[in-house]
């Protein structure tokens, strides 16, 4: 089949001369028999720049710290999941020295933010069919620490709210102007599926669930704990809300055994000081009827210790 012929674009054996643009760097000819370097290799850096070396060194340090943190977390996880974990954690808790509620101070601005000229007001929506006793206990404890302006309202979605719930904060006679209070605490009895807390619409979303709200309120006391203690406290709060309140009879029995074991080593669930774990577990036990005589010995003793404190005994009157 005949085809058309293309004329050669260079002559015979003469070298090919191509004008290359000067805006790009040159590379050596891969077909050349010589190994001469590129004619213009000024773009190649013989040594790394100091800034690049500093970046590499910083990256190595970060990776080293990450490996150390991973090793620490792995060791802690192994300690908690081994049979002798209780003994190890107890030793760590004894070495820790938590601050007490009575002596520690906290700047509310560091937690709630600074709002010039406005009272920091915490608004809680709660269902009167299931009063969140832990929040009422924490309210009383907050009143012992700060100047709290307390108010109670009833939403139109509920009717016939018991008188003791309407007056759960007692007779609130305002003795000073609003700006002289440090904290506002507003409780609204409302038909809601879960207890809700709203503080600042601009800076934070609502918090749902009695356990989560209790965590937030207890943080206002400024207690300092190490990582192990904080993990145990959060674990007890989750156990109260998910296993003790919503779990099966077997799960509840397992919770009682764990509580009895922990209270056999210390007066409170986590160490020698009252924590939010004690408040939330006590509240759930009262609401679910778990505080009856069927509770183990150490749990019964712990319940009496709670009820000997004024904030607990006052909240307990709301169920009668």
UniProtKB/Swiss-Prot annotation:
<dbReference type="GO" id="GO:0006915">
    <property type="term" value="P:apoptotic process"/>
</dbReference>
<dbReference type="InterPro" id="IPR031889">
    <property type="entry name" value="AIMP2_LysRS-bd"/>
</dbReference>
<dbReference type="Pfam" id="PF16780">
    <property type="entry name" value="AIMP2_LysRS_bd"/>
</dbReference>
<protein>
    <recommendedName>
        <fullName>Aminoacyl tRNA synthase complex-interacting multifunctional protein 2</fullName>
    </recommendedName>
</protein>
<dbReference type="GO" id="GO:0008285">
    <property type="term" value="P:negative regulation of cell population proliferation"/>
</dbReference>
<feature type="region of interest" description="Interaction with TP53">
    <location>
        <begin position="162"/>
        <end position="225"/>
    </location>
</feature>
<dbReference type="InterPro" id="IPR004046">
    <property type="entry name" value="GST_C"/>
</dbReference>
<dbReference type="GO" id="GO:0005829">
    <property type="term" value="C:cytosol"/>
</dbReference>
<keyword id="KW-0648">Protein biosynthesis</keyword>
<dbReference type="GO" id="GO:0065003">
    <property type="term" value="P:protein-containing complex assembly"/>
</dbReference>
<dbReference type="GO" id="GO:0043525">
    <property type="term" value="P:positive regulation of neuron apoptotic process"/>
</dbReference>
<feature type="region of interest" description="Interaction with PRKN">
    <location>
        <begin position="82"/>
        <end position="162"/>
    </location>
</feature>
<dbReference type="GO" id="GO:0060090">
    <property type="term" value="F:molecular adaptor activity"/>
</dbReference>
<dbReference type="GO" id="GO:0060510">
    <property type="term" value="P:type II pneumocyte differentiation"/>
</dbReference>
<keyword id="KW-0539">Nucleus</keyword>
<comment type="subunit">
    <text>Part of the multisynthetase complex (MSC), a multisubunit complex that groups tRNA ligases for Arg (RARS1), Asp (DARS1), Gln (QARS1), Ile (IARS1), Leu (LARS1), Lys (KARS1), Met (MARS1) the bifunctional ligase for Glu and Pro (EPRS1) and the auxiliary subunits AIMP1/p43, AIMP2/p38 and EEF1E1/p18. Interacts (via N-terminus) with KARS1. Interacts with EPRS1. Forms a linear complex that contains MARS1, EEF1E1, EPRS1 and AIMP2 that is at the core of the multisubunit complex. Binds FUBP1 (via C-terminus).</text>
</comment>
<dbReference type="InterPro" id="IPR036282">
    <property type="entry name" value="Glutathione-S-Trfase_C_sf"/>
</dbReference>
<comment type="function">
    <text>Required for assembly and stability of the aminoacyl-tRNA synthase complex. Mediates ubiquitination and degradation of FUBP1, a transcriptional activator of MYC, leading to MYC down-regulation which is required for aveolar type II cell differentiation. Blocks MDM2-mediated ubiquitination and degradation of p53/TP53. Functions as a proapoptotic factor.</text>
</comment>
<dbReference type="InterPro" id="IPR041503">
    <property type="entry name" value="AIMP2_thioredoxin"/>
</dbReference>
<keyword id="KW-0597">Phosphoprotein</keyword>
<feature type="domain" description="GST C-terminal">
    <location>
        <begin position="220"/>
        <end position="317"/>
    </location>
</feature>
<keyword id="KW-0217">Developmental protein</keyword>
<dbReference type="Pfam" id="PF00043">
    <property type="entry name" value="GST_C"/>
</dbReference>
<dbReference type="GO" id="GO:0005634">
    <property type="term" value="C:nucleus"/>
</dbReference>
<dbReference type="GO" id="GO:0006412">
    <property type="term" value="P:translation"/>
</dbReference>
<dbReference type="Pfam" id="PF18569">
    <property type="entry name" value="Thioredoxin_16"/>
</dbReference>
<feature type="modified residue" description="Phosphoserine">
    <location>
        <position position="36"/>
    </location>
</feature>
<keyword id="KW-0963">Cytoplasm</keyword>
<dbReference type="GO" id="GO:0031398">
    <property type="term" value="P:positive regulation of protein ubiquitination"/>
</dbReference>
<keyword id="KW-0832">Ubl conjugation</keyword>
<keyword id="KW-0221">Differentiation</keyword>
<dbReference type="GO" id="GO:0016567">
    <property type="term" value="P:protein ubiquitination"/>
</dbReference>
<dbReference type="InterPro" id="IPR042360">
    <property type="entry name" value="AIMP2"/>
</dbReference>
<dbReference type="GO" id="GO:0017101">
    <property type="term" value="C:aminoacyl-tRNA synthetase multienzyme complex"/>
</dbReference>
<keyword id="KW-0053">Apoptosis</keyword>
């Amino acid at each position: 089949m005949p085809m058309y012929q293309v004329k050669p674009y260079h002559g015979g054996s003469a070298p090919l001369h191509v004008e290359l643009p000067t805006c790009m760097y040159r590379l050596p000819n891969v077909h050349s028999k010589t190994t001469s370097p590129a004619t213009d290799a000024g773009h190649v850096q013989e040594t790394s720049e100091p800034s690049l070396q500093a970046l590499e060194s910083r990256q190595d340090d970060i990776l080293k710290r990450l490996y150390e943190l991973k090793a620490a977390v792995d060791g802690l996880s192994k300690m908690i999941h081994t049979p002798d974990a209780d003994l190890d954690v107890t030793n760590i808790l004894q070495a820790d020295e938590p601050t007490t509620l009575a002596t520690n101070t906290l700047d509310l601005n560091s937690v709630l933010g600074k709002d010039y000229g406005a009272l920091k007001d915490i608004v809680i929506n709660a269902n009167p069919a299931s009063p969140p006793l832990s929040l009422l206990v924490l309210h009383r404890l907050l009143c012992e620490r700060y100047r709290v302006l307390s108010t109670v309202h009833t939403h139109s979605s509920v009717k016939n709210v018991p008188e003791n719930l309407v007056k759960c904060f007692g007779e609130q006679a305002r003795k000073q102007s609003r700006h002289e209070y440090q904290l506002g605490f507003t409780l609204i009895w409302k038909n809601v599926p879960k207890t809700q807390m709203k503080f600042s619409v601009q800076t934070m979303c609502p918090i749902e669930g009695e356990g989560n709200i209790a965590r937030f309120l207890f943080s206002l006391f400024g207690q300092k704990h190490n990582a192990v203690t904080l993990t145990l406290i959060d674990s007890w709060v989750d156990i109260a809300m998910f296993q003790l309140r919503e779990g099966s009879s077997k799960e509840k029995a397992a919770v009682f055994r764990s509580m009895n074991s922990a209270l056999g080593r210390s007066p409170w669930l986590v160490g020698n000081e009252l924590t939010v774990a004690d408040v939330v577990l006590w509240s759930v036990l009262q609401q679910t009827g778990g505080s009856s005589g069927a509770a183990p010995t150490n749990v019964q003793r712990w319940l009496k210790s709670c009820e000997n404190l004024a904030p607990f005994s006052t909240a307990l009157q709301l169920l009668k």
